[in-house]
Swiss-Prot record:
Catalytic activity: S-(5-deoxy-D-ribos-5-yl)-L-homocysteine = (S)-4,5-dihydroxypentane-2,3-dione + L-homocysteine
UniProt-recorded name of the protein: S-ribosylhomocysteine lyase
Keywords in alphabetical order: Autoinducer synthesis, Iron, Lyase, Metal-binding, Quorum sensing
Keyword Iron: yes
Length: 168
């Protein structure tokens, strides 16, 4: 099985919250797709609570589109990482890490401004596979944490995993 790019970076050196360009690729038609690692937590030291990350998934996707889409950028998908330390965001275009960080911070402000659980989009059994597993309070605590700590940039060249550790 091929080793995925996400496992070629040293998770012990990652900062959080931080944005990282995880991958770029060009489609056959010439569009650039960029995948960003939006790391909310320091790997193996912090973890996002399941209800909070789920609620954040519902809110973050819309808010990031509000703040980042346009001028050659269109978000394809924002999905939580299985390890619950962040999200991957795939988009068409090549925004800078700073543009992504600014949109992320603005989105966290938006999460903090959601008044009650009834305002969470798609929060029903028809549009959500686990619609009862949500917590606006947890999502807002995650957002507050990001706002308090700010968003750094994780650079791939600083996180390259030593070859000797690849299958440790």
């Amino acid at each position: 099985m091929p080793l995925l790019d996400s496992f070629k970076v040293d998770h012990t050196r990652m900062h959080a919250p931080a944005v990282r360009v995880a991958k770029t690729m060009t489609t056959p038609k010439g569009d650039t797709i960029t995948v960003f690692d939006l790391r909310f937590c320091i790997p193996n030291k912090e973890i996002l609570p399941e209800k909070g990350i789920h609620t954040l998934e519902h809110l973050f996707a819309g808010f990031m589109r509000d703040h980042l889409n346009g001028n050659g950028v269109e978000i394809i998908d924002i999905s939580p990482m299985g390890c619950r330390t962040g999200f991957y965001m795939s988009l068409i275009g090549t925004p800078s890490e700073q543009q992504v960080a600014d949109a992320w911070l603005a989105s966290m402000q938006d999460v903090g401004n959601v008044k009650d659980q009834s305002k969470i989009p798609e929060l029903n059994e028809y549009q959500c596979g686990t619609y009862q597993m949500h917590s606006l309070a947890e999502a807002q605590q995650i957002a507050q944490n990001v706002l308090a700590r700010k968003v750094a940039v994780n650079k791939n060249e600083e996180l390259t995993l030593d070859e000797g550790l690849l299958n440790a």
